[in-house]
Amino acid sequence: MFEILTTDQMYEADRRTIEGGVPGDVLMQNAGRVVFDEIIRHWSPRAVSVLCGPGNNGGDGFAIARLLREQGWSVRLGLMGDIADLKGDAALHAARWEGATERLSPALVVGADLVVDCIFGAGLARAISGELAELVTTINSSPCGVVSVDVPSGVDGNTGMVLGVAVKADLTVTFCRAKPGHYLLPGRLMCGELAIRDIGITDQTILEIAPSCWRNDPVLWRSGIHWPGLEGHKYHRGHLLAFGGASMTGATRLVARAARRSGVGLLTIVADASALPIYASDAPGNMTAPMSAFDALVNDCRHNAFVIGPGFGVGDDTRALVLRLLHLCRATVLDADALTSFAEDPSTLCFAVQGPTVLTPHEGEFARLFPDITGDKLCRARAAAKRCGATVLIKGADTVIAAPDGRAAISAADVPWLATAGSGDVLAGIIGGLMAQGMNSFDAACMGVWLHARSAADIGPGLIAEDIPEHLPAILRELWLASRKKA
């Protein structure tokens, strides 16, 4: 279940399933059942208020309320609007509800131990205001538990944006597949625990819809990993050139360590001659070369991948060097100063991209490079990737990776420990190392983000950037052993 569906794709999955012979009211009953199952798994019987909106999300609420009442729970049900105005499957399930129906209001939250939010689904298109906003505020300030159905009311399912105000849930139960808004900020913060439950929509139906966005997971990229064979040697595993600055040497040293731990066969740090003693003393396995040898280095096709930017410095010299590297059409990772150096002329950078390239901006760098690209993070990453013909990775708690052809992945990892100096340099090194080993740019970016986050999750509080590369071998071993079992 790692595909991510837009709201329109989810509507299409529902439609195809109904056309295939599964009645809509059965899908709604199934939805009510899986939410009921999640509720009784998390809570014992208590006073619950089920808050229903005027659409299918409200119909789910009637199904949930009936199941809870049948199990002896004390249930109050509030409805937005008149029950006579409900249509289709929602009206069918409302007719099966034998309890009282109250007007939707903040009073329903008072005295409740649990609130089930079925007010609005993922397709909400307008800001919540007025009395409904007061209701949401009351829910969020109440000590009761909160379950949201589909998405927390007020969250845009496609973008994660909060439309006015939004319910802050302890548990969100969605159906079939997650939506972008479950993983993109700030919506992700409103969801609490996310449960994705099957309601009878087949995998074949999802395949036919052809999603182009996924939760970043090894299933997405594991087939693209180039594991070394017994007959291989270090030159088969790539030779990465990491370009380092003369003063902020720590950044490129982190790049180098991460790239080598990712499995690259050889690594050379290229820097001003004055800085080479620092780089040479950092790790005996690192090779070094002076910047004066640039032409000879890049004319050697065995040097098949480049990382430039971390600690390198911003300016015309950096711009010129990046353009020369891009002209070679080899695997290239551009980060930090390599991106900022083009802030005044981003079109030159985009025009120069020809080979497999990954751009790894954080939000500030992205805004400087693409000031005219607005919208949610997923939309912006896709637009920038298409414009530049490169894989674009916008870093953050909800990292998004997008390819020029529109494919995208969202990181669902919860790893606040990555907010530390140097972690971005490590990520650039991991991605560069994977590309040097032959992985395509989109897969390398996705795998790099996953390894980076998984390492941080395993290490936990107290993490510093230097810790991340040292944890990579254990994770890579897990992936390798899993690949052997599948073979």
Model segments located where?
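Short acidic low-complexity segments
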Residues: 100-111, 290-299
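Contiguous, small/hydrophobic- and glycine-enriched helical/loop subdomains that border
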Residues: 97
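Small-residue (G/A/S/T)-rich helix-start motifs and N-terminal tracts that mark the onset
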Residues: 1-80, 87, 171, 182-333, ...
